[in-house]
């Protein structure tokens, strides 16, 4: 993404990040350990991700209700305590300028800023910054101190405030304590108790950048330029001090966090209105990160041997920059300094590339963090100059120079978005400071009518089953609507009926022509029903789509000899196209959906691995994934109505035939010569063709763990259990976005 650097210089420092990180050549080598199955057979599906964060690792217990505990919290008292903390400087880590505001802004930013829109992973929603690898990323150096400074507050309020809420709330309080009016704040994040296994990049060294190919093309879904960074290298790409090339990196990485140019410029300029970076001396004097630090340091890392190691001697990034003359006050001084001087390339005391006002201009106008009688020259990062040199950023920031009120408004909105981007719809937010829903929160209208009851539900099911739509059509449409959900950032799902809107209605996986016919039929049923009702009772299309799926499952179960009722709770509403950001929703389009036997053409990753990824996004366990595959194959719900994996002679009957026939030793499988990613099953004795399948189907007979699950549902006495488990898993998926039911 960047051009070659036009500036010649001596070399690159290893100490680089968007804000701060020490020089660490590579992660600590692993100690000898027994080999795992994953080591021996790395290509097997990684099912452990479906069982992470179990109740066994949670000390709060299965019945802990964070919402109920939070309701007991005095949020105003909490806010006062956090703000008081800002100016309570501790000798073991003294506050720059007597105020921890800059440190806490950085902590909150880096907690939330790992979010990436491509797969919804990262973000501050679970307090993951407390654990490896994030707690030891080079870019998060010294944030261990920020979390320790917060401990007395956490200790005081206990289970009424989660770490994940507190880590991001502290930054909000920091801004307000320095005179900034924030846009709002929502609590409601719940803690995890073990590290998440997330693909952060292919590198095995800190600050490695093997993630690029071609003309600096960043591999998806990654959102940072180097391993261990949140966004970009503040010295420039790979330490090359080129502001224009750095702008390209900035635009790419912030865009992958769902920020546009205005939001990006606002966050950088707003965040750098406060505090400083730290590079008082040689970065090689900084000790190991928290996960590699000696046990006696009790989880604190990056202990420095330079001088006192703290305060005026602190080293974090190797950069030594104070951006403004008022680093503990909100004003427009960052932009005034940025545009008020011409800049020349210099080096910090640690040898990192940074910029200083030319010809000694402004000398003494910038305060020293610990000596009020001393003054400094204005300094900036390479990435700061990007806001002035890149034409698009320059147009935005130069306007703000003359219109500071616009800058303040844009920073407030961008900061709010940064802290909350991974939390899903506003209905999940808690507390008194939640503003109205924003477009990026995928809003849906409030229910403004009486909901359907049992009698209306029964009548609508009858209309649906008499409409001429097949079980396959009913089930496929309901699944397509609900299975857009991502548990990583709580986006997607059936609420809103966005399957009828752009972009979802046009996705290949949804078979647009077929989908249109189904939706037209359901919309007619909806209109006829709503026009015939009195007393304000109505049904939304979102509810009707899910109800239609339930009716289809019930009919299929009846076809197999089972009389069941699929749970259904009305209350969904229909979003409008104006409430739907097409570009933002585009990232939800599945590259694969093994539940419908869909694989995007040209996809390089194994289909079975993508199935596990889809199951993870749907918060499914391995048994739930297994029973859903078997049931959806029996219901003939494949993309394009292919017969792959439909191992039954009675499709649209909810039977366990998929498992019975998959495990039948009378079938021999081989790769199909006529189609990629397709297998053909033939009779072991006669050689007659029997079935076709994909890797998603066959993995349930090939993988030992999945085969064990398949065997449970293939036994002679498993039919009832299969139906019950399928209905339970189906209902779970249909309600993944029903946060109003929690």
Curated annotation (Swiss-Prot):
- Tryptophyl-tyrosyl-methioninium (Tyr-Met) (with W-109) cross-link, chain position(s): 231-257
Keyword terms: Heme, Hydrogen peroxide, Iron, Metal-binding, Oxidoreductase, Peroxidase
Q: Which reaction does it catalyse?
A: H2O2 + AH2 = A + 2 H2O; 2 H2O2 = O2 + 2 H2O
Residue ranges spanning the membrane: these are: none
How is this chain modified after translation?
Formation of the three residue Trp-Tyr-Met cross-link is important for the catalase, but not the peroxidase activity of the enzyme.
Presence of keyword Iron: yes
Asked whether the UniProt record includes Phosphoprotein among its keywords, one would answer no
Query: Could you tell me which InterPro entries the record lists for this protein?
Result: Catalase_peroxidase, Haem_peroxidase, Haem_peroxidase_sf, Peroxidases_AS, Peroxidases_heam-ligand_BS
According to its record, what are the GO cellular component terms? cytosol
Give site residues, Transition state stabilizer.
106
Instruction: Write one Gene Ontology MF term.
Output: metal ion binding
| Cross-link type Tryptophyl-tyrosyl-methioninium (Trp-Tyr) (with M-257), residue numbers | 109-231
Kindly list the cofactors needed: heme b
Q: How does it assemble?
A: Homodimer or homotetramer.
Query: What is the protein's known function?
Result: Bifunctional enzyme with both catalase and broad-spectrum peroxidase activity.
Q: Which family does it belong to?
A: Belongs to the peroxidase family. Peroxidase/catalase subfamily.
Q: Which NCBIfam families match?
A: cat_per_HPI, PRK15061.1
The name on file for this protein is Catalase-peroxidase
Q: Which organism is this protein's natural source?
A: Rhodococcus opacus (strain B4)
């Amino acid at each position: 993404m960047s051009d070659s650097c036009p500036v010649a210089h001596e070399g690159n420092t290893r100490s680089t990040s968007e804000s701060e990180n020490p020089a660490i050549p590579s992660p600590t080598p692993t100690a000898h350990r027994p080999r795992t199955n994953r080591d021996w057979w790395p290509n097997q599906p990684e099912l452990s991700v479906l069982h992470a964060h179990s109740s066994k690792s949670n000390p709060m217990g299965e019945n802990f209700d964070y919402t109920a505990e939070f309701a007991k919290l005095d949020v105003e008292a909490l806010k006062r305590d956090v703000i008081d903390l800002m100016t309570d400087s501790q000798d073991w880590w003294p506050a720059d300028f007597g105020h921890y505001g800059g440190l806490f802004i950085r902590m909150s930013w880096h907690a939330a800023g790992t979010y990436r829109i491509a797969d919804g992973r990262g973000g501050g929603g679970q307090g993951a910054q407390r654990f490896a690898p994030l707690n030891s990323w080079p870019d998060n150096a010294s944030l261990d101190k920020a979390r320790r400074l917060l401990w007395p507050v956490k200790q005081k309020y206990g289970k009424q405030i989660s770490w994940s809420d507190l880590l991001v709330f502290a930054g909000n309080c920091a801004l307000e304590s320095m005179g900034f009016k924030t846009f709002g704040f929502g609590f409601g994040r719940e803690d995890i108790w073990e590290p998440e296994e997330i693909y952060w990049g292919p590198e095995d060294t800190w600050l490695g950048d093997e993630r690029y190919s071609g003309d600096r093309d960043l591999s998806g879904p990654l959102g940072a330029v180097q391993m261990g960074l949140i966004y970009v290298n503040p010295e420039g790409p790979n330490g090359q001090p080129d502001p224009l090339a750095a702008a390209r990196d900035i635009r790419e990485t912030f865009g992958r966090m769902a920020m546009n140019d205005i939001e990006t410029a606002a966050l950088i300029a707003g965040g750098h209105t406060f505090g400083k970076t730290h590079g008082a001396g040689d970065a090689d004097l900084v000790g190991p990160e928290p996960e590699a630090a000696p046990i006696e340091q009790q989880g604190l890392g990056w202990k420095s041997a330079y001088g006192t190691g703290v305060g005026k001697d602190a080293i974090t990034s190797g950069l030594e920059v104070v951006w403004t003359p008022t680093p503990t006050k909100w004003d427009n001084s960052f932009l005034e300094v940025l545009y008020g001087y011409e800049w020349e390339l210099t080096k910090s005391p640690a040898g990192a590339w940074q910029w200083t006002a030319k010809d000694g201009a402004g000398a003494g106008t910038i305060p020293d963090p610990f000596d009020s009688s001393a003054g400094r020259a204005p300094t900036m990062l390479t990435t700061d100059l990007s806001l002035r040199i890149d034409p698009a950023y320059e147009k935005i920031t130069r306007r703000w120079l003359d219109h500071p009120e616009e800058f303040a408004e844009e920073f407030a909105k961008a900061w709010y978005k940064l802290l909350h981007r991974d939390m899903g719809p506003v209905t999940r937010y808690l507390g008194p400071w939640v503003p109205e829903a924003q477009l990026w929160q995928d809003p849906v209208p409030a229910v403004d009518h009486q909901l359907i009851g049992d009698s209306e539900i029964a009548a609508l099911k009858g209309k649906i089953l008499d409409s001429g739509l097949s079980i396959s059509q009913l089930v496929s449409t309901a699944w397509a609507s609900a299975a857009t959900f991502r548990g990583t950032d709580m986006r997607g799902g059936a609420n809103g009926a966005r399957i009828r809107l752009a972009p979802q209605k046009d996705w290949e996986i949804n078979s647009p022509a077929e989908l249109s016919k189904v939706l037209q039929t359901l919309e007619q049923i909806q209109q006829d029903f709503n026009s015939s009702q009195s007393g304000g009772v109505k049904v939304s299309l979102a509810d009707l789509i899910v109800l239609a799926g339930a009716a289809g499952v019930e009919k299929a179960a009846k076809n197999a000899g089972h009389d069941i009722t699929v749970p259904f709770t009305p209350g969904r509403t229909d979003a409008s196209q104006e409430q739907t950001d097409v570009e933002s929703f585009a990232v939800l389009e599945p590259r694969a959906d093994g539940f419908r036997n869909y694989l995007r053409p040209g996809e390089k990753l194994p289909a079975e691995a993508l199935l596990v990824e889809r199951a993870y996004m749907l918060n499914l366990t391995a048994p739930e994934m297994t029973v859903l595959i078997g049931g959806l194959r029996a219901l003939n719900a494949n993309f394009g109505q292919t017969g792959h994996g439909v191992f039954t002679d009675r499709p649209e009957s909810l039977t366990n035939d998929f498992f019975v026939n998959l495990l039948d030793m009378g079938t021999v499988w081989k790769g199909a010569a006529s189609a990629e990613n397709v297998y053909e099953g033939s009779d072991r004795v006669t050689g007659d063709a029997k079935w076709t399948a994909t890797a998603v189907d066959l993995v349930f007979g090939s993988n030992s763990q999945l085969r064990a699950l398949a065997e449970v549902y293939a036994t002679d006495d498993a039919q009832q259990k299969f139906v019950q488990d399928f209905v339970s898993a189906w209902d779970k998926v249909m309600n993944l976005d029903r946060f109003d039911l929690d």
